[in-house]
Amino acid sequence: MKKTFINREELEAIVAEFPTPFHLYDEKGIREKARAVNQAFSWNQGFKEYFAVKATPTPAILKILQEEGCGVDCSSYVELLMSHKLDFPGSEIMFSSNNTPDKEYAYACELGATINLDAFEDIEHLERAAGIPEIISCRYNPGGVFELGTDIMDNPGEAKFGMTKDQLFEAFAILKEKGAKTFGIHSFLASNTVTHLYYPELARQLFELAVEIKEKLGIWLDFINLSGGIGVNYRPDQEPNDIALISEGVRKVYEEVLTPAGLGQVKIFTELGRFMLAPHGALVTRVTHKKKTYRTYLGVDASAVNLMRPAMYGAYHHITNMTHPEGPAEVVDVVGSLCENNDKFAVNRELPHTEIGDLLVIHDTGAHGFSMGYQYNAKLRSAEILCTEEGKARQIRRAERPEDYFATLYGFDFDKDE
């Protein structure tokens, strides 16, 4: 059974003030997670966590992480702009993008962000847009499949991201010739891994590559970015990742590979998003309909526009009935109101007997939840509420209104007949 970070009485008080559906975040949990990550990697003097903004692009959340010493990993102009408006200095902004417009390279350079080049061909784009900066990173894709033991974790060879090894070496040589002085590498090989072995294996590949870069190019890397990929236990029967154990595995490989090669000062960076935020957010929704045909359907006031992952990936998110957490079980589909049959949060899920009006919590939506929202069927995006460390509920993003939906349209008078 998954635990919620809020009890029934607390949730009912919040719902009395803010109508469902909404995304709810736990400030205490977010701060504790950031501190745990920083403590786990404290053995590395230059360690920095650059939170993946794409996971939860909400200023109030980014400010919490900033206060805990995190930087930001941006992938677009607006994410860069948001980070700048929140007073993240360029040294705390990593710009990891792909198929990047020239204006975004120019803006990233203007801010002093570290650019992580996705493609060998991007050298030309970057030079044309802003010149070659002194600090530069390149993204590596080893190709093939990524395995841990006998398990295939992912297939980098089919990913659109990164450079081949030959391209990487040529890129570093060219960038050095064009004036770059400080170098780093980055790689992302698997998503949402629930194992303490992923980071150490990725680290080994990148550390050995760093040694080879030093020997063949005479370039001492300043940092190695392990990016993201550490996942969360969406299912209650999964063991959560232990970041201290994961970091210890990385440290052992660091001392085995980098230190003997004279690279014992290399900084370790991470770009965790899901691991940092997912467990500390939930989608709160109310049951509005109950329908029985060939199955039993619980209709809720949230839909895939509020949480796309189950519809898009078939992803599992645990669901807790906060109103009636116990009782005789029934097998149900939990569904939204979109005109799409994949608008389902759960399929053939066993839940306690549920009635219209019950409050449901959909777990682990703190990352890639609100951020993946959209407006199909002219649905409006929901509010975001923060449970503060003081036990208060604070709205950090209001729900969209109809006038927001029409705000960008020309030739349409929203106020007509009023």
Protein language model regions, located:
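A charged N-terminal "starter" segment
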Residues: 1-115, 120-134, 175-181, 213-215, ...
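Conserved, mostly hydrophobic/aromatic
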Residues: 30, 54, 76, 108, ...
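Flexible loop/turn segments at secondary-structure boundaries
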Residues: 57-60, 101, 145-146, 191-195, ...
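Structured core elements
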Residues: 71, 94, 114-116, 137-139, ...
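Glycine-rich, aromatic-flanked loop segments that form ligand/cofactor-binding clefts
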Residues: 131-145
